[in-house]
A protein has these predicted regions:
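Active-site mouth loops of central-metabolism enzymes
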Residues: 6-10, 30-34, 56, 148-156
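Long, contiguous binding/interaction regions
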Residues: 15, 23-26
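Short hydrophobic/aromatic-enriched beta-strand-loop microsegments
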Residues: 50-58, 79, 106
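Glycine-rich phosphate-binding active-site loops on the catalytic face of alpha/beta enzymes
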Residues: 54-60, 167-186
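Catalytic alpha/beta core domains of metabolic enzymes, predominantly
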Residues: 65-179
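Conserved small/polar residues in nucleotide/adenosyl-binding loops
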Residues: 209-211
Length: 211
């Protein structure tokens, strides 16, 4: 996919879908990838991808979201929608509604923070009140947190994961790489599988605590 600026690693295209199919075959895990165009949707459906997600820059463009929604008509597949890059709840809800109006029922939202010129602490400001309001507006919608994109630095992932759990998010999307420093994109926000396992085991999930 196109990066914020040209020149960075933008993926290998359709060839990568075959890799995901192999991962699914070897591990039995569901596989997921981002779609930004109707062509992406068609290729992913043809490859048997289990879950699709709409990226933050795409969510901010109703034209692109509608194109994706049209391509998904008549298809039953889970679709997750990231918040738009700008802090606009109506834009986020609008993207969810466009996909819902195409007949898809298995929808979820991903909170990955909002762009800001000031990046003193976070890569993307969490502005937790926005996903909290989304929960109030659409109570049954699963909402996941992406601490990797919010934090932008691996040392922030653990506390952001715990904060998301404290706010009753339904799950986490954390970037992991066997050798994070050698990752071709977003290396600073990735953790090894062992560190990810450690972070997850440390989480305190209040809904699971029996008093």
């Amino acid at each position: 996919k196109p990066r914020t600026k040209p020149g960075g690693f933008e993926g290998i295209g359709v060839e990568g879908l075959a890799w995901l199919k192999e991962v699914k075959k070897e591990t039995g895990m569901y596989v997921s990838t981002e779609v930004a165009t109707a062509k992406h949707v068609y290729e992913c459906l043809k490859a048997g991808i289990d879950i699709l997600w709409v990226g933050a820059r795409t969510t901010a463009n109703p034209f692109a979201v509608q194109e994706i929604a049209d391509a998904l008509k008549g298809v039953d597949i889970p679709v997750l929608v990231k918040n738009p890059v700008n802090p606009d709840l109506e834009l986020w809800i609008g993207a969810l509604e466009r996909i819902s109006n195409a007949g898809l029922k298995r929808l979820g939202a991903i909170h990955r923070g909002f762009s800001s010129y000031d990046k003193k602490i976070y890569r993307n400001l969490p502005q937790w009140h926005i996903p909290i309001e989304l929960r109030r507006r659409i109570p049954n919608l699963p909402i996941f947190c992406d601490p990797s994109h919010i934090g932008g630095k691996r040392e922030l992932i653990a506390p952001l994961c715990q904060q998301a759990m404290d706010l009753n998010f339904d799950g986490l999307i954390v970037e992991s790489h066997c050798n994070p420093d050698c990752a071709w994109s977003d290396a600073s926000q990735q953790v090894t599988p062992d560190v990810l396992d450690y972070i997850l085991n440390l989480l305190v999930i209040l809904s699971l605590i029996h008093i």
